[in-house]
């Protein structure tokens, strides 16, 4: 039985690399939550560099991802805001040679700017060095045929009225997909009250 497999591994550098101008906002979205606060989430400096797969398999797609997610909260109690900032992808493929998708990733190298990571194993508010082993595994039954799968590659707990998370050269692969693969990056801000806002970028073609 073959599977559509998606895997992320992260390099040790935290230097953000992007061909676009620094702080160039790619997309953003705002929403007013139940407490009257305006929640805004942005993606900036997004770059997905598709490369020839090392396994030389025609069903494999490989890429490196750099970018930044930023959030802002305005309104009453903005400084007391608590929530989660997520980055991830919507993955689209015309055909899969199997019945499932498996996903795993290694905790990414990230730089927190103006935010705070409060949950273990982090406990820091500056630079995080990743674990050497995958931290999350996700499986889903897709069956044969076209499909779209949304996967949050990582998330951090944040506090305060604003903050940003940068990721450099996240390594991703998709195997078992016949035809091209489209990746639509997203950033999502989820308040502790349950309110959320998600911004989606333009699809990147990993042919």
UniProtKB/Swiss-Prot annotation:
What are the GO MF terms of this UniProt record? porin activity
Q: Which Gene3D superfamilies match?
A: Porin MspA (Ig-like beta-sandwich domain), Porin MspA ribbon domain
Q: Name the SUPFAM superfamilies on file.
A: Leukocidin-like
Where is it localised?
A: Cell outer membrane; Secreted, Cell wall
Gene Ontology biological process terms from the UniProt entry: monoatomic ion transport
Database matches in InterPro entries: Leukocidin/porin_MspA_sf (IPR036435), Porin_fam_mycobact-type (IPR015286)
- The disulfide bridges present are none
What does the UniProt function comment say about this protein?
A backup porin induced when MspA, the major porin, is deleted. It probably forms a water-filled channel which favors the permeation of cations. There are about 2400 porins in wild-type, 800 in an mspA deletion and 150 in a double mspA-mspC deletion.
UniProt record similarity statement: Belongs to the mycobacterial porin (TC 1.B.24) family.
What protein is this chain from?
Answer: Porin MspD
Task: Cite the source lineage.
Answer: Bacteria, Bacillati, Actinomycetota, Actinomycetes, Mycobacteriales
Q: Hey, what's the signal peptide range on this chain? A: 1-24
Q: What happens when the gene is disrupted?
A: Single deletion is viable. A triple mspA-mspC-mspD deletion grows slower than the single mspA or double mspA-mspC deletions and has reduced Fe(3+) transport compared to wild-type.
One GO cellular component term of this record is: extracellular region
What is its induction behaviour?
Not expressed in wild-type cells, it is induced in an mspA deletion mutant.
């Amino acid at each position: 039985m073959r599977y559509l497999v998606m895997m992320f591994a992260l390099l040790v550098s935290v230097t953000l690399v992007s061909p676009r101008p620094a702080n160039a906002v790619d997309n953003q979205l705002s929403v007013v939550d139940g407490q009257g606060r305006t929640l805004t989430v942005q993606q900036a400096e997004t770059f997905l560099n598709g490369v020839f797969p090392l396994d030389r398999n025609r069903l494999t797609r490989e890429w490196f991802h750099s970018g930044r997610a930023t959030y802002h909260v305005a309104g009453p109690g903005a400084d007391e805001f608590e929530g989660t900032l997520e980055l991830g992808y919507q993955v689209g493929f015309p055909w899969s040679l199997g019945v499932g998708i498996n996903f795993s990733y290694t905790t990414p190298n990230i730089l927190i700017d103006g935010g705070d990571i409060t949950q273990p194993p982090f406990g820091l508010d500056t630079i995080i060095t990743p674990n050497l082993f995958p931290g999350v595994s996700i499986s889903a039954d897709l069956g044969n045929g076209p499909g779209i799968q949304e996967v949050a590659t990582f998330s951090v707990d944040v506090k305060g009225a604003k903050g940003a998370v940068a990721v450099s050269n996240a390594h991703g692969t998709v195997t078992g997909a016949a035809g091209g693969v489209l990746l639509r990056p997203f950033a999502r801000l989820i308040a502790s009250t349950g309110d959320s806002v998600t911004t989606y970028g333009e699809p990147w073609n990993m042919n």
